């Protein structure tokens, strides 16, 4: 039986990345290389190696009591490149369209998806912050649909279930949060079902606190990812806003997951040496209100460790909190 709280790895394993041969899932290339005559073939070769290394990373995780991992959004170089999609570059449009279908790597994606499912290894995505569901610009919104749609397509080909979510932020407020929230709701409902089925909403450090997104979640039936560091940073950037205590927010947050029958996921990090919001190398303390959830609210949860030292930070927390290890 798995422990009620499991810690998750974000995209990179520092140990595997530094070894020879190196293991990681985000080999990429500059656009100019992609535009060369053999650019698509090079992109495919790097993608195949990225997919192969996902299995190696899963195996390492399992050996070290890690059963949750965020996949990189850069497994496939330039997959959602807007200019290439719109045939505004030197890339052969027919070759690029075929590249975006992912049919050329369907077997490899199906195999790694089956492997993850067989190992009960949860995989998630956190697409980039340039994705703006509430965008004013139609082009920005269409770029968002393209990128999120390709993320969803990867999971669908892999055969991943509803626990394989895509976490996004609210984005900008465009000088009027109320109007933006209305537009966010409307444009979310315009998105393809494949995207809507996997999208979850995370609070951010400046624009959208948990209490801003609870009504959106309830209206659209979207789960909420509570980020502990963003919750703290929001107080710094919005000193006049009185947020409820994090402990008091747990019931409505957990309810958003219960309604969809998806395992709740949280993000934790701590302040680093840079600007407010910068992530530290390690996480020293898991908030008590998260540790209390399995007993207090009868829910198992996953916690993504957003620390710069990646798996090293998780192993240190396993030592500090031995109950988190099977």
Regions found by a protein language model. Name each.
Residues 1-122, 131-145, 149-160, 164, ...:
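Alpha/beta catalytic barrel-like cores
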Residues 126, 227, 303:
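Conserved, mostly hydrophobic/aromatic
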Residues 129, 205, 230:
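Short, glycine/acidic-enriched loop or turn micro-motifs at the edges of active sites
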Residues 166-171:
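Short, charge-patterned binding micro-sites
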Residues 178, 201-207:
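Domain-core and long-helix interface of multi-subunit machines
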Residues 179-184, 246:
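A general structural motif
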Residues 208-209, 229-235:
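Short acidic, Gly/Ser-rich segments with clustered Asp/Glu that frequently serve as metal-coordination loops
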Residues 220-226:
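Conserved active-site beta-strand-loop modules that form the wall/rim of enzyme catalytic pockets
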